[in-house]
């Protein structure tokens, strides 16, 4: 399990496959379509967002770790995909995170200290 978290590009690809094979089919089943805009809180390298971008969605990823955000930008650019990635605390994001019909939190909620505010 440690290797899976130290090889960030492999982890990116693993997350991408999870979204492609599970999240997107489930979302299509439940709401009938993929929303046009997707926000991921705690996006890391953005792997979960890649299949949404490939499907034509506007994607935004937010993570408190600036290194992960830089990796997200790099991994998306290498795959010729568009995405907006912001290194900040979700509570500092304010207006940029409004009007997203779909918000993902994959292995993140337990790291948010002020859950009441969230």
Task: Label every model-predicted segment.
Residues 1-98, 102, 106:
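Conserved N-terminal segment of class I S-adenosyl-L-methionine
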Residues 107-111:
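A short His-aromatic
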Residues 112-118:
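A short, conserved alpha-helix within the catalytic core of class I
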């Amino acid at each position: 399990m440690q290797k899976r978290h130290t090889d960030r590009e492999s982890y990116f690809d693993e997350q991408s496959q999870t979204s492609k094979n599970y999240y997107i089919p489930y979302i299509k089943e439940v709401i009938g379509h993929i929303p046009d805009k997707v926000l991921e809180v705690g996006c890391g390298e953005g792997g979960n967002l890649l299949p949404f971008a490939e499907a034509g969605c506007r994607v935004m990823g937010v993570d408190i770790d600036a290194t992960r955000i830089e990796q997200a930008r790099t991994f998306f650019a290498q795959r010729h995909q568009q995405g907006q990635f912001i290194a900040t605390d979700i509570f500092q994001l304010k207006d940029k995170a409004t009007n997203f019909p779909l918000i993902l939190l994959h292995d993140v909620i337990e790291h948010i200290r002020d859950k009441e505010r969230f």
